[in-house]
Amino acid sequence: MKQFFKILFGIAVISSFLVAGDVEEIKKQIIDNNEYSNKNNRSVNEYSKSGALEYWSSGGLIQEIDPDGRPEVYDYFNIKVKHIEVVVLVPKKAAVAMYYSEGSMKPKNSPAVNHYLTRVTQAYVNENGKWKVRASHWSPIQGGSGTSQTSTE
């Protein structure tokens, strides 16, 4: 019986390290990709090889995103992400991230959004050792605005 508890304890410790690694990897990816967008006025393609489904903060119907991503280019992009929480569903395979995205932006060929303030939920899958987005839901927070984009075209 003592041996059983040692094994059980060992599994619990190893599992917690796996989960902690996933959490930190995804948080870092969200922060790094946001910093890239702020510096380059364009987004990083982090979509799954299967593409993704998204609800955008501008409202409207669900958007189907190709694996190549969506062409997000901005005249300016000044967004901060904060309060990132990650829930690991299956260690090293699937997780959900939730966070806030706040600032201002002007997507190319769309109106400026001066008080962008949204809640973000994203489902991630691990593909060949890299976390990729499979689904996203962006919803505006009361007092803020969502994006002015309404189409992938």
What name fits each language-model region?
Residues 67-110:
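Surface-exposed, charged secondary-structure patches
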